[in-house]
A protein has these predicted regions:
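Sec-dependent N-terminal signal peptides of Gram-positive bacterial secreted proteins and lipoproteins
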Residues: 4-22
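N-terminal catalytic or cofactor-binding beta/alpha core of small enzyme domains
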Residues: 27, 31-278
Length: 278
C-alpha cells in the first residue's frame, strides 16, 4: 500500500516538474520573439550606463531638439554669470582673421560630435573656429542656449568681417539626416550638392531648425553668409566607432569612422569651391 502511494506521489511530482519546464520554455520563446521586450531591456541598460555625460535621457536616445523651448539659461551672459568656466564648460577658439568661421555653439557633451567636426573642418581648411564645450560629468543639456539668444561677446566679435559662418548643431532623430538651414546662398547649395553626392541624406529643416531667424547669430552680420547644419543623433553616432559618443571615444581620431571623414571632406570641398582663395 505504501509503495502504491509513493508511486502516485512520484508520478505527480514528475508531472508538475514537466509542466513547469514547458511553461518556462514557452514564456522564454515568447520573450525572444517579442522585439519590444528585448528593446526595452537594452534601452534601459543604455540609459543607465551611458547617460552620465548628458545628464538627460534626451540626447542619448536622440530625442533632444537643437532648439529647445525651455532653456535653463536665457542668454550666454546669464549662463556664464551662474556657472563656472573650467568646471561646467570651456571654450576652444582660434581667431586669426580668416574669412571662414566654423562654430559649435552646443559642443562637448551637449550635442556630441559637433565639437570634433568643427575643429576637424577648421584644421583641414585652416579656418577660424569657436566651440563652446560642456564638460560636466552630468546635466550638460542644461548648458544649451538657443541660437537666437546666443549673445556670447567673443563669438559676436568673431563673426564680424567674415565671408561665411558655418554653425554645426545636433538635432533629434534616429535616422541619419542632415538639415541645411540659413538663408539660401551659393555655399548652401554647394554643401547640399557635395553631401548628396557622397550618399548623405539631406533634408529641408523644420521651421525651428531653419536658421533663418534674424536674431540667430549666423544672421546678425549682413554680408556674412550664414549656414546652419543640423545633424541628427543617428548621424553623429555614425561618426564614431561602435556608435559611441562618450567623451573618451570621441577624443581619439582613430575612433573616427569613414563616414566622419566623408562628411568632413564634403564640407571642405564645398567651402573651397565657393571661396577658393580663403
Amino acid at each position: 500500500m505504501n509503495k502504491v502511494i509513493l508511486g502516485i506521489v512520484i508520478t505527480l511530482i514528475v508531472s508538475i516538474l514537466l509542466n513547469f519546464d514547458m511553461n518556462v520554455e514557452a514564456n522564454t520563446k515568447k520573450c525572444s520573439q517579442n522585439p519590444y521586450v528585448t528593446t526595452d531591456i537594452i534601452q534601459s541598460q543604455k540609459l543607465s550606463s551611458l547617460n552620465t555625460e548628458t545628464g538627460s535621457n534626451s540626447e542619448m536616445v536622440g530625442i533632444a531638439p537643437s532648439e529647445r523651448e525651455n532653456d535653463k539659461y536665457q542668454s550666454m551672459t546669464q549662463l556664464e554669470d551662474e556657472t563656472t568656466e573650467g568646471v561646467d564648460w570651456k571654450k576652444s577658439i582660434r581667431n586669426t582673421g580668416k574669412e571662414i568661421l566654423i562654430v559649435a555653439p552646443h559642443g562637448g557633451n551637449i550635442e556630441q560630435g559637433t565639437t570634433e567636426l568643427t575643429k576637424a573642418l577648421a584644421d583641414k581648411g585652416n579656418y577660424d573656429y569657436f566651440s563652446f564645450e560642456a564638460i560636466r560629468p552630468k546635466n550638460n543639456s542644461e548648458l544649451h542656449v538657443t541660437s537666437r539668444n546666443y549673445n556670447d561677446l567673443m563669438l559676436n566679435s568673431m563673426i564680424q568681417n567674415r565671408k561665411a559662418t558655418i554653425s554645426i548643431h545636433g538635432a533629434k532623430g534616429n535616422e541619419k539626416i542632415v538639415y541645411i538651414g540659413g538663408p539660401r546662398s551659393d555655399l548652401r547649395n554647394e554643401i547640399e550638392k557635395e553631401l548628396v553626392s557622397r550618399g548623405f541624406n539631406v533634408m529641408v529643416p523644420p521651421d525651428n531648425l531653419s536658421g533663418k531667424d534674424d536674431e540667430n547669430f549666423i544672421n546678425r552680420e549682413k554680408g556674412n553668409t550664414g549656414i546652419q547644419l543640423e545633424l541628427t543623433y543617428a548621424l553623429r553616432k555614425s561618426f564614431f566607432t561602435n556608435n559611441d559618443v562618450r567623451t573618451k571615444n570621441r577624443s581619439y581620431q582613430y575612433n573616427w569612422t569613414h563616414e566622419m571623414y566623408e562628411f568632413l571632406d564634403a564640407l571642405y570641398n564645398s567651402i573651397h569651391n565657393i571661396y577658393p582663395n580663403t
